[in-house]
Amino acid sequence: MSRDFLLLDGVLRQDALRWLYGAGEPIEVIPLYNGTRWDGVKELGPILVGLDSHSSLLGEWRSSLNLQRQASKLQSSATLNDVADHLSQFITIMDNLGSYSLFRFADPLVSSYWLGSYSPSAYESLLGPISEWLVALPPPNWAPSQSGEWQSYRPQTNSHKLKGKLNHLADDQVQALEQAYRRSFKERLYGWLIEDYPQTLSSLGEQERGQWLEQRLFDAEAWGLVSERSIAIWLERCACWGDDFATRSDSPYQAWLARTPGVQNLAPEQRIQALDEDCLAG
């Protein structure tokens, strides 16, 4: 008989184990980092929860946008251990260059982009004993009135098996995860900007906010910035001095260049961080 599971991301729900065990109902819980080299931080990894048919946790997940951002729902007729064993194959991933890394596949945003990057014929291999993987993809935080998406992934019978290891990411998957990261980064930037510099974005419509964020990211990257810190500094200067602060002849940035010897010879990352330090120093 098929049963429901929740797959929680421990980074997004750092009180997950306390919350689950405090629910006061029969559940089975397996942190997927159990017995691995990451056992010491298992509460921050993927956590699989087996539910009974009357679980209040399932109802809470269905009604809570916040919880849907932290967990997805699986269905399977297999045991909790069998589902956990299958999912454990994805704890680390490898790309075409041979690079290994930890994979936060339990983050619904990540799983949405990752699973969506495969053709439907891949799901029989990819999902294994899982008969459905249901992911809620809420609208981005800069466009809350947009409709969210429910994405259901199911295996197709008689599909060709995936070649190679399941945790190997081809170029399509790598690109999809880059898109997931970019959306997550934009949401974090928006949350910070709307709190500290609300005047920058509050007058824009939802679509315009997304376009503004994307254009500022593009500008920062074109200028040579790579790190999150430097890109955040760039957006802060845009909020304070205008979107064209780096090119406008009368901007405070040009005045700073003129009075600060040697900074023009710094690499972009060093230069924007030196600018930030001087701004903080007043």
Locate each region found by the language model.
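A contiguous, surface-oriented mixed alpha/beta subdomain in the mid-to-C-terminal portion of proteins
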Residues: 1-43, 48-56, 74-81, 88-102, ...
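Short acidic, gly/pro-rich beta-turn/loop elements at beta-sheet edges
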Residues: 59
